[in-house]
Structure formats: structure tokens, C-alpha cells
């Protein structure tokens, strides 16, 4: 099993080209099931989760061909299987997004109850609720969610019980082929939902309101083919900006969207960073100074993203002063904290809050990644710690960061991927 070996400390400075968004690419890939015509997707990142998604789609009968450097041709005309099996779904919760398109286009579909990062309970209840409102019959048996409908799904007025990115994407995609109008309220507003809606509209869907708390979908009978470029990854952008902040360096992120990161940029500015933005770039300069501790509360977009919480925990750990981070989206999302304590962090967890008392420096240690974003914080910690840090279980980071060690090396990090003990 591979691991990272990192020699610190170092100041990270330079330019980073941001990859396509994992959190947009996954629902868009699953949404290709809605069309029987060829689709070209561009700016697709090379990630483990993308590979898993393509393997799942191929098992359903989808033809997928990679075209360097970052495009994939998708043809879902000959789908002849309607079940997403446990072997693939267990590694990635996003597989639930196959269910809506399958039942919308083919009248049936089944997906194994999902797996993925071990971050608390991410129930599928809201996905099921939304599909039922559209007329789908749902059964849960033998570890599978089975959905079916006679004829087409029917448009409905749906008020989601809770703001959920995943459920919003499921219901919105299924509603594109439903008969009539669907009004979906209390939906998530994340940019990745807007990107998915824009993609579906390119194919002939009629979706309005994505990015607000109410989405209106006028159902159509079929979707055509087309070409679409995935949005840049705002979480990868934020991660590399934090890399510059915690190492007292200067980092420029290119091919990104500053407007999707306003909450993160505000906190980085509060931490003492000099921030400049252009149309598709963001510059962060710490002028060689330690960051100042900040208080953060994760909330749905446009609030501070839960996927940046672990990185800001690290920022507070090496900042001047004391910072409090409150996690309101997922429970059990502080699994990186005990690992950072091994490196010298002064941190206290109280329920869904982590209190960080800043220290001057961390010490290298052997640590273990527990989930995608936590693994990123551990890698960055290794870059700024005194001595050698090894990060185990880096398959977590490969799920969501494209060539992270190569990008960090270009910024001045001493990091290598090595073979660990079996």
C-alpha cells in the first residue's frame, strides 16, 4: 500500500493549475445516463472516484473512452443493466446518483446502499423521498435501493426536509425526463449543482433556479448529446491557498473561479493573507508571516464549506492565537485531529467543535489518513512540520486530488510516493 514521505519544513510558493471539479464531474457523469446520444465531457480530473464511476457506468452498458489530456466520450445508448453493484458502490457514496437517471429514462434502477468516506451518517432518505414524490416506487431489500415507475415519472411540488447537495442532484436530474413541471424547494445552492444544471440544459433539459433555494424543472421527453467543460475544483483551490497560508508562502491558483470561494477567501483575509483575484485566478501572499487564528462555522453554500474544515483546522493549529471551528454539516468529521496531535498540535474537541491553540511549529510523525479532506490536511501538515512525516492510506487523497504530490513539488515541497508495508 502506497504512502507519502514528506521532508519539512518548507515554504510553499509558486503557481498551481487547478483541475476540474470532482464534486461536479461525478453527478455530471451519472447524468449522462439520461441521454442516448454521444456526450463529450472536458476538464475531467484523473481521480480514483472518476475511475470508479466510469467502471460503474461501463457495467451498466455505457461506452466510455478517455481522450487525452482531459476529455471523456460517453455513449449511454446501449445501457442494458440497471443495477449498480455493491462491489463498486461500497467505495463511493456518489454512486447513489445513478438511481435517479436510471428510473427516469428506463423506468427502473437499483443501487446498493452506498459506502465512501467514513464521515458520520449520510442517509439516503432524502434521495428516496424526492424520487417517491416524482412517482417512483421504492423498495429497500437485500442491501439495495430498488426504484421503478410505470411510464414516466410525474412532475411534482417537492419541499426537501433538509438542505442536501446529494438529494438535490438526484431529484433535479430525475425531474428532467419527468412528465410536467417539478418545483423543488429548500434545495442546496452549491456551484456544482449549477454546473450540473448547466450541463443538462446544454443537452436540452429545462432547468431554472439552480443556485437558489428553489429549482423549477420543465420535464422533456428526451435529451440530446453535446459537449461540456467541467467547472474548476473550488475545494482543491482552497486547499492550495491554505498550503500557502500555513507555510507563510505565496501561491497563485490558476484556472479557478474566485466567485465560488468568497467565504473561504474572507477567512483567509481575516487570517492575515493578502488576497488578489482576477477572472480565473487567485493569489495569496503571507509575506512570510504566521496566519492569525480564525473562528469558522461550516454551513451550506454560500457559507463556509465543510470540505475546507480540516484544512482550516491545520491553519488554526499553526496560527497565532486561539481559533474555534464548528462543524454543522457532518458529525464525526474531526478524525484528522488525533493525527495532528501526534505532530504537536494543541487541540481540544468538544462535541462538534474543535478549539485550536496555535503553536509555533509541528514535528514530523507517522500519521494515517481517515478520509479525503482530512488526508489533505495531514499532507500539508507534513510539508510545514520539522522532520519527516509519513502519511498512510493515501488512497483517500487519490479519490479527490489530482497528482497532489506533483503540484506540491512545483511549490517547493519535498514529497514522494513510496511503497509502504503490506
From Swiss-Prot:
Its EC number is 2.5.1.7. HAMAP family: MurA (MF_00111). GO terms for molecular function: UDP-N-acetylglucosamine 1-carboxyvinyltransferase activity. The keyword Cytoplasm applies. One of its GO terms (biological process) is UDP-N-acetylgalactosamine biosynthetic process. It comes from the Bacteria. It is found in: Cytoplasm. The keyword Ligase does not apply. It holds the Pfam family EPSP_synthase. Pathway: Cell wall biogenesis; peptidoglycan biosynthesis. Keywords: Cell cycle, Cell division, Cell shape, Cell wall biogenesis/degradation, Cytoplasm, Peptidoglycan synthesis, Pyruvate, Transferase. One of its GO terms (cellular component) is cytoplasm. Cell wall formation. Adds enolpyruvyl to UDP-N-acetylglucosamine. This is UDP-N-acetylglucosamine 1-carboxyvinyltransferase. Belongs to the EPSP synthase family. MurA subfamily. The active site is at 117 (proton donor). The modification 2-(S-cysteinyl)pyruvic acid O-phosphothioketal is found at residue 117. Phosphoenolpyruvate binds at residues 22-23. UDP-N-acetyl-alpha-D-glucosamine binds at residues 93, 122-126, 162-165, 307, 329. It catalyses: phosphoenolpyruvate + UDP-N-acetyl-alpha-D-glucosamine = UDP-N-acetyl-3-O-(1-carboxyvinyl)-alpha-D-glucosamine + phosphate.
Amino acid at each position: 500500500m502506497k504512502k507519502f514521505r514528506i521532508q519539512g519544513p518548507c515554504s510553499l510558493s509558486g503557481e498551481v493549475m487547478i483541475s476540474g471539479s470532482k464534486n461536479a464531474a461525478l453527478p455530471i457523469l451519472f447524468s449522462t445516463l439520461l441521454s442516448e446520444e454521444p456526450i463529450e465531457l472536458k476538464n475531467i480530473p484523473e481521480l480514483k472516484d472518476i475511475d470508479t464511476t466510469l467502471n460503474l457506468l461501463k457495467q451498466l452498458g455505457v461506452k466510455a473512452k478517455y481522450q487525452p489530456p482531459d476529455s471523456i466520450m460517453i455513449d449511454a445508448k446501449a445501457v442494458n443493466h440497471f443495477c449498480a453493484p455493491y462491489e463498486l458502490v461500497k467505495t463511493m457514496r456518489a454512486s447513489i446518483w445513478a438511481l435517479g437517471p436510471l428510473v427516469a429514462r428506463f423506468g427502473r434502477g437499483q443501487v446498493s446502499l452506498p459506502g465512501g468516506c467514513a464521515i458520520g451518517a449520510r442517509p439516503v432518505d432524502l434521495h428516496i423521498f424526492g424520487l417517491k414524490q416524482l412517482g417512483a416506487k421504492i423498495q429497500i431489500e437485500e442491501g439495495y435501493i430498488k426504484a421503478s415507475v410505470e411510464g414516466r415519472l410525474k412532475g411534482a411540488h417537492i419541499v426537501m426536509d433538509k438542505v442536501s447537495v446529494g438529494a438535490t442532484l438526484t431529484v433535479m436530474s430525475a425531474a428532467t425526463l419527468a412528465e410536467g413541471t417539478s418545483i423543488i424547494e429548500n434545495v442546496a445552492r452549491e456551484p456544482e449543482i449549477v454546473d450540473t444544471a448547466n450541463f443538462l440544459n446544454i443537452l436540452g433539459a429545462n432547468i431554472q433556479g439552480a443556485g437558489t433555494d428553489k429549482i423549477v424543472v420543465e420535464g422533456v421527453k428526451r435529451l440530446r448529446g453535446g459537449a461540456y467543460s467541467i467547472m474548476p475544483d473550488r475545494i482543491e483551490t482552497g486547499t492550495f491557498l491554505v498550503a500557502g497560508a500555513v507555510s507563510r508562502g505565496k501561491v497563485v491558483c490558476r484556472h479557478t473561479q474566485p466567485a465560488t470561494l468568497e467565504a473561504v477567501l474572507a477567512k483567509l483575509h481575516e487570517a492575515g493573507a493578502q488576497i488578489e483575484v482576477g477572472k480565473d485566478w487567485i493569489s495569496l501572499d503571507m509575506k512570510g508571516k504566521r496566519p492569525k487564528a480564525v473562528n469558522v462555522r461550516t454551513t451550506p453554500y454560500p457559507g463556509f464549506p465543510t470540505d475546507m474544515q480540516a484544512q482550516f483546522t491545520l491553519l488554526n493549529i499553526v496560527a497565532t492565537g486561539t481559533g474555534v471551528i464548528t462543524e454543522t454539516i457532518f458529525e464525526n468529521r474531526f478524525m484528522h485531529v488525533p493525527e495532528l496531535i501526534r505532530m504537536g498540535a494543541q487541540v481540544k474537541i468538544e462535541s462538534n467543535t474543535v478549539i485550536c491553540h496555535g503553536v509555533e511549529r509541528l514535528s514530523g510523525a507517522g500519521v494515517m489518513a481517515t478520509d479525503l479532506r482530512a488526508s489533505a490536511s495531514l499532507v500539508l501538515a507534513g510539508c510545514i512540520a520539522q522532520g519527516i512525516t509519513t502519511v498512510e492510506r493515501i488512497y483517500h487523497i487519490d479519490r479527490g486530488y489530482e497528482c497532489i504530490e506533483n503540484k506540491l513539488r512545483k511549490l517547493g515541497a519535498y514529497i514522494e510516493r513510496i511503497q509502504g508495508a503490506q
